[in-house]
Design a protein with these regions (language model features):
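Extreme N-terminal basic, low-complexity initiation segments
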Residues: 2-8
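Asp-based, Mg2+/Mn2+-dependent phosphohydrolase catalytic module
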Residues: 16-55, 129, 133-136, 140-245
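Active-site neighborhood of HAD-like aspartate-dependent phosphohydrolases
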Residues: 33-86
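Acidic donor-diphosphate engagement hotspot in glycosyltransferases and nucleotidyltransferases
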Residues: 64-66, 127, 148
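Alpha-helical elements of Rossmann-like donor-binding domains used by nucleotide-donor carbohydrate transfer enzymes
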Residues: 68, 72, 96-100, 114, ...
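Hydrophobic alpha-helical core bundles mediating ligand binding, dimerization, or RNAP-core interactions
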Residues: 69-74, 94, 111-119, 152-156
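Short, surface-exposed acidic
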Residues: 77-88, 102-114, 164
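Metal-dependent phosphoesterase signature
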Residues: 94-129
Length: 245
């Protein structure tokens, strides 16, 4: 019996190890497929044939949201991040979302007021609209690519529809921002080769590294914390100096 128990334990340990290993490999190669570091082989930006400029939205053109709707909704509904994402991505009707997530009626009013106040306070950065207006006058085609949910799409269209030709929102895409295929889909939707596009954003991996990896030009609107791209902007209006226009 001792031998049987030992064999069982041996195979149990190995089964656990290989299950963990398979999960780990899946996580690394599929779930975390956005680049993590900037390879030395990345080419320098070349703006000679630039025709399209793609901007991130929140944190780049707009002040970021201050209310963590993901965390708050997950906590109140006792739901996973994936469950919260599915609910938020499916609708721009906050009442419908709260009902679907079984948020108690007693706390729905407070939650809705906080979200609406948060959305109302979102404003363009002071240099954003003058910059977009000038770029449009110089015949650049402008796009916005944002990782967001339907509730937060309104401020983007409200402030930038006069200047931006195309809006790309994560909840409308098969591949979300951060996934490598997202950037190839983006280029296809714009009907341009990668070298004619410039991506500008404040997220080191999703805006800078991932767009570079897809062959685009990219500029990192750097923060005072975290990693900073080799080709960067300190402020939005510095873009005009970089492009020499």
């Amino acid at each position: 019996m001792g031998g049987v128990d030992s064999d069982f334990f041996f195979w149990l340990v190995h089964a656990f190890f290989y299950t963990w290993l398979i999960f780990r490999l899946y996580f690394v190669f599929f779930l975390m497929n956005e680049p993590r570091e900037e390879p030395e082989s990345f080419w320098k930006n070349n703006y000679d044939q630039l025709s399209h400029i793609i901007f991130d939205a929140y944190g780049t053109l707009l002040s970021p949201s201050k209310y963590n709707i993901w965390q708050e909704l997950g906590k109140r509904a006792k739901a996973t991040r994936e469950e919260v994402w599915r609910a938020l991505a499916a609708s721009d009707d906050l009442q419908e979302i709260l009902d679907k997530m079984a948020i108690p009626k007693a706390s729905q009013k407070e939650f809705m007021e906080k979200v609406r106040d948060d959305i109302a306070q979102i404003q363009p950065h002071p240099d954003a609209i003058p910059l977009l207006k000038y770029l449009k006058e110089r015949k650049y085609s402008l796009a916005i690519d944002s990782f967001l949910i339907p509730l937060y799409a309104g401020p983007i269209k409200e402030h930038f529809s006069d200047y931006v030709e195309k809006f790309v929102f994560s909840f409308e895409q098969q591949h979300m921002k951060g996934e490598s295929q997202h950037y190839f889909d983006l280029l296809q939707s714009l009907n341009i080769p990668a070298h004619q596009a410039l991506f500008v954003g404040d997220h080191y991996r999703r805006d800078y590294l991932a767009s570079k990896a897809a062959g685009m030009n990219a500029l990192h609107l750097s923060n005072k914390w975290g990693k900073v791209g080799k080709e960067k902007l300190a402020t939005l209006d510095e873009l005009l100096t970089v492009l020499n226009i």
